């Protein structure tokens, strides 16, 4: 009975996972480029500090977004490694942004709680779901 529910729920959970990861990535791109780089600066969700990236930040951001989209593509192709690409690209960009990038200006401790919440959600969506449905993912 448990396997039957697991099998039937896979398609729904799979598409919700892809929609949430893709939607968050598209929102991040919009907030970083349109509002942050081209506009007056963006705020991190849940925090009032304004982040204004420069051209180098934008270039590095776009490189890591390629890795994030590649991870989502691999998840779409049912490859577990896609979750690691997604999570790794996000984490490495976070390290860059907090040391040399736009987050360094406001300090990572000011946005630590939202970052922890986002990464917990990312781990559930990109690592735990492929692990739970390991019979479907390679």
Residue ranges and their predicted role:
Residues 1-138:
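Topology signature of small-to-medium multi-pass alpha-helical membrane proteins
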């Amino acid at each position: 009975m448990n396997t039957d529910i697991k099998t039937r729920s896979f398609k729904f959970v799979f598409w919700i996972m892809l929609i949430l990861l893709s939607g968050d990535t598209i929102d991040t791109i919009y907030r970083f480029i349109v509002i942050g780089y081209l506009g007056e600066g963006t705020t991190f969700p849940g925090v009032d500090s304004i982040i204004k990236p420069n051209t180098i930040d934008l270039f590095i951001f776009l490189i890591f977004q390629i890795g994030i989209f590649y991870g989502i593509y691999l998840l779409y192709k049912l490859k577990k490694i896609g979750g690691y690409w997604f999570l790794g690209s996000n984490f490495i960009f976070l390290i860059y942004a907090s040391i040399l990038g736009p987050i360094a200006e406001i300090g990572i401790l000011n946005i630590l709680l939202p970052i922890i919440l986002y990464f917990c959600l990312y781990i559930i969506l990109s690592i735990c779901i492929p692990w739970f449905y390991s019979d479907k993912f390679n």
